[in-house]
Amino acid sequence: LIAVLLIACDSEKKEQKDQINKENKSSAAFVLDNAKNSVEWTAYKTTEKVPVKGKFKKVEITSGGEGNSVKEAIHNAEFSIPISSIFTSDSSRDYKIRKFFFGVMENTKLLSGKLVIENDSLGYADITMNGITDKLPFTYLIDDKKFSMATKMDVLNWNAKSSLDSLNLICKELHKGLDGISKTWSEVAINITSTF
């Protein structure tokens, strides 16, 4: 009798769980959380402006991100990106960026933001980093079910000079150019794609 009750209760719990999962699935045609999202960046070192490429391996959609078109799904989508998901194909570089750049900032375990589409080619992201929220304009293109955006960010707009100085100090020799000057640029190119 106990075994029958346990099996019956277990089946009831499974049915309730299945019902909750069905309710959480969106009926929207385009769901950003289900898309293949890529957040890639290019920073620069040395006076010759040598590119250093990387990406964030994880992005979480925290609000919105659904619609009956790609544009609708992107517009007003809110996201967060864990700093721990940074990846440059060099684990020692990843550690230095996390500790000596982001680690110097205020409240920056996550980068967060909201995407706003203004017209058929322009938008902006309200990016929160280092305790500061600032507007970052971008250009974008929608090709079938793929959204691509590009922008350039100046980290000084997020009061990140001390973070930049900290990273440049720890990477002093690695960031020296042919002229013998060590430089870490404040400009970062960002490319984001979402394929639905």
Where do the PLM segments sit?
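Sec-dependent bacterial lipoprotein signal peptides
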Residues: 1-7
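Low-complexity, acidic/polar, glycine-enriched regions of mature
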Residues: 9-196
